[in-house]
């Protein structure tokens, strides 16, 4: 199979995706035009910045490791080069399943909780693959798990950005993508630093771990803010209900 066949397959997949979006995604009305300046108002709040930072740090953490998954598998885990396509396929399957699993349970948990929990599992998987990379089954399983976590948290993070954006939803979605791409680039650079210093390939997971840890910290703060506000709203509803009961009492 020539290299042109791979491009043809990718183009066919893109065409199928385009057709599926046209068929399955419902039409929605255009967003109201609130003016240019209004699109930036949501950036006055803390929460969008926390989520944007977490998107960059979390994805940067994963790609610090994943950018060097080939040398990790071949030189540390002793996975044959002929099996690398299987490893990459498993990681891709993990991404799909992580996204689907998050969607399945999204009605039972808040987006803040899902994002923080997924980020927590991501950082633990990166720490684990650093120590267990010499055992090929663990290295492959943890790589798949980490890949699943990245796309597990992507949905809740996008929802959090859109929900906090108000008049600037398109800008928020764009900034989330910018943060994602910046995290990928910076993460790949940081992951390569230990290798440049002569360390084994599994050391790429260490910068990834600390990036993911920082991202988890931001999402944890975001979750705390959400929890405090939920408690305040609950207390307000209880107080209003008490006042209503007292007003009806003889």
Indicate where each model-derived feature is located:
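Juxtamembrane intracellular "pre-TM" segments in multi-pass secondary transporters
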Residues: 23-54
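C-terminal transmembrane helical hairpin of 12-TM major facilitator-type secondary transporters
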Residues: 112-157
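Multi-pass alpha-helical transporter architecture, strongest
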Residues: 20-22, 209-243, 249-250
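C-terminal membrane-cytosol helix-exit motif in multi-pass small-molecule transporters
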Residues: 6, 11-31, 218-223
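A late C-terminal transmembrane helix in Major Facilitator Superfamily
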Residues: 163-201, 207-208
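Helix-to-loop junctions at the C-terminal end of transmembrane segments
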Residues: 97-111, 195-196
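A membrane-interface helix-boundary motif in multi-pass transporters
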Residues: 1-11, 80, 193-213
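Pair of pore-lining "gating" transmembrane helices in MFS-fold secondary transporters
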Residues: 44-64, 144-148
């Amino acid at each position: 199979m020539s290299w042109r066949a791979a491009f043809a397959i990718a183009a066919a997949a893109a065409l199928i995706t385009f057709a599926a979006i046209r068929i399955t995604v419902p039409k929605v009305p255009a967003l109201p035009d609130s003016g240019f300046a209004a699109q930036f108002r949501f950036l006055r709040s803390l929460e969008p910045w926390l989520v944007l930072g977490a998107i960059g740090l979390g994805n940067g953490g994963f790609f610090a490791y994943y950018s060097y998954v080939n040398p990790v598998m071949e030189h540390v885990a002793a996975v044959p080069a002929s099996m690398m396509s299987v490893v990459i396929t498993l990681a891709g399957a993990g991404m799909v399943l992580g996204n689907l699993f998050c969607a399945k349970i999204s009605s039972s948990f808040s987006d803040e909780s899902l994002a923080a929990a997924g980020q927590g599992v991501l950082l633990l998987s990166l720490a684990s693959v650093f120590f267990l990379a010499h055992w090929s089954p663990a290295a492959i399983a943890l790589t798949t798990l980490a890949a699943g976590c990245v796309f597990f948290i992507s949905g809740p993070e996008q929802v959090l950005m859109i929900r906090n954006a108000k008049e600037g939803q398109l800008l928020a979605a764009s900034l989330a993508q910018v943060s994602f791409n910046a995290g990928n680039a910076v993460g790949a650079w940081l992951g390569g630093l230990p290798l440049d210093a002569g360390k084994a390939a599994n050391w790429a997971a260490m910068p990834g771990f600390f990036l993911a840890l920082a991202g988890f910290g931001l999402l944890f703060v975001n979750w705390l803010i959400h929890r405090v506000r939920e408690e305040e709203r609950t207390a307000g509803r209880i107080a209003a209900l008490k006042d209503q009961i007292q007003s009806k009492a003889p």
